[in-house]
A protein has these predicted regions:
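Bacterial N-terminal signal peptides that target proteins for export
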Residues: 1-9
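Bacterial N-terminal signal peptides
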Residues: 9-17
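Boundary/entry segment of secreted carbohydrate-active catalytic domains
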Residues: 27-55
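Hydrophobic faces of well-ordered beta-strands that scaffold small-molecule active sites
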Residues: 32-38, 70-72, 99-104, 140-142
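Conserved, mostly hydrophobic/aromatic
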Residues: 36, 62, 70, 92, ...
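Acidic-and-aromatic substrate-binding clefts and catalytic sites of carbohydrate-active enzymes
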Residues: 42-52, 72-85, 107-121, 146-155
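Catalytic domains of carbohydrate-active enzymes, especially glycoside hydrolases
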Residues: 55-75, 135-139
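Active-site acidic/histidine proton-transfer and metal-coordination neighborhood
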Residues: 91, 98, 109-167
Length: 167
């Protein structure tokens, strides 16, 4: 009697777990959003207008590896990797990823730093920001800046970056 009761309880427990187990196996794990900075593959795709060839196969390989987004690193003269921002975005999306950010910068000239008038640099940033929006980038990262030697220069750079950020 005890053995039979034990067997029935075990069978009921197994049946109770089966639907949950089956549905859990049927569901796919959510895809993780993992991005890659394209600067890390610059030897394959080039940077700053110096193309190493067609970057589309590299984008496809990155997507096949599981990457879902990219950070570009080759903005120059309104172009990303030698393409219009719209074409670059299309190429990235055709590979199955999205452009999430880029990294680029424009350091102030000695004259701009001394005068505190960086309106020319801000005009460049306006064009840069418009291009990056067209490429689908949500963020622009400034990866580096020139060496600052005085508090006044640092304060000028702080005002400069605050102006850029407000755009």
């Amino acid at each position: 009697m005890r053995n039979r009761l034990f067997a029935v309880i075990c069978a009921l427990l197994a049946l109770a777990m089966l639907p949950g187990g089956a549905s859990a196996r049927a569901k796919k794990a959510p895809k993780k959003d993992i991005g890659i900075q394209l600067y890390s593959v610059r030897s394959l795709i080039g940077v700053f207008g110096k193309s190493q060839g067609d970057y589309k196969p590299v984008l496809k390989q990155l997507a096949d590896m599981g990457y879902t987004s990219v950070e570009a690193a080759s903005y120059k003269d309104g172009m990303l990797y030698g393409q219009t921002p719209e074409q670059f975005r299309k190429d990235v999306e055709d590979a199955g990823m999205r452009v999430i950010s880029t990294h680029c910068t424009l350091n102030l000239s000695d004259e701009e730093l001394a005068s505190g008038d960086f309106s020319k640099a801000l005009a460049w940033w306006d064009e840069c920001i418009a291009a990056h929006k067209a490429a689908g980038a949500e963020y622009i990262v400034v990866p580096s800046m020139r060496k600052i030697s005085t508090l006044k220069d640092l304060q000028t750079y702080c005002r400069y970056f605050n102006e850029v950020g407000a755009r």
